């Protein structure tokens, strides 16, 4: 039975595509290209995001269990056509999705990226960068081709009320507000760049001095051999196994669990952010025996550590009032809290989520 996929772009354009459940994500991309045009939506440049996850080309649509009431975000990355030697380096991230594996070097090179006021003066010297170290430049997107980025910013820059709308829109992909704000800041409020940074890593750590030493120690150790999964050590940890099973049962809980992990073990969260593809692949591995979310909440903070800790969620008075209003709809407190934090403390989204879950159960 055919399903209708609702798609939304970063410019708030919404359209629908009819798909057979057996058809793959690649077919969906081809249909998007056919409907919207190869110039605007080339298959090779499309990234489809649902519930904070990038959809893989060879996976059937039915495997992602896309709710027709929700939407899939379409992000298009285009090769820059600006003259000069910066063209090959700008085209490489879009032509080869695997280029994200070179991003562990991005924090080191990204820390020297020019401030906003110096963009125009820096562009000539920036264009010569690929001749010295093309590998690091392709990994550190903002430090190359700043002229091309200014063109992007001129056409897609968001400010004022549009900024808040865009912020909410990107958060709906499953990212924390703080990370979205940081990505928008690093991209000079260019939403395309911001989403790209969230997917591949935000260049330039907000804590360059004391944070860079710890990050280099974390990243150097696992990346000594090419092709090795730096997150392999998580596979044998029961806390991660339980977390994986819960996420597969309800992908909407991933942002809340990652937020909790960031509070308990920020270094591990940084490492996961640098290796999102491997982490998502591990999350998508076949689960074992099903577990309950209540068994996982207290274990998330213990991932990467030897012993679990007790974890408590702190809420403000306003957040408590929002939770009470959601409970008044007739849902149990435990389910309300899960939905509220899974929806990044957005009361309306949480209410819609709870109502849709209730409808599905009936």
Curated annotation (Swiss-Prot):
Annotated GO biological process: nucleotide-excision repair; proteasome-mediated ubiquitin-dependent protein catabolic process
Any one cellular-component term (Gene Ontology): nucleoplasm
Keywords: DNA damage, DNA repair, Isopeptide bond, Nucleus, Phosphoprotein, Proteasome, Repeat, Ubl conjugation
Single GO MF descriptor: polyubiquitin modification-dependent protein binding
Predominant location: nucleus
Record bears the keyword Nucleus: yes
Biased composition regions of type Low complexity, renumbered to the chain: 88-109, 126-144
Family in the record: Belongs to the RAD23 family.
Stated name of the protein: UV excision repair protein RAD23 homolog A
Species of the source: Bos taurus (Bovine)
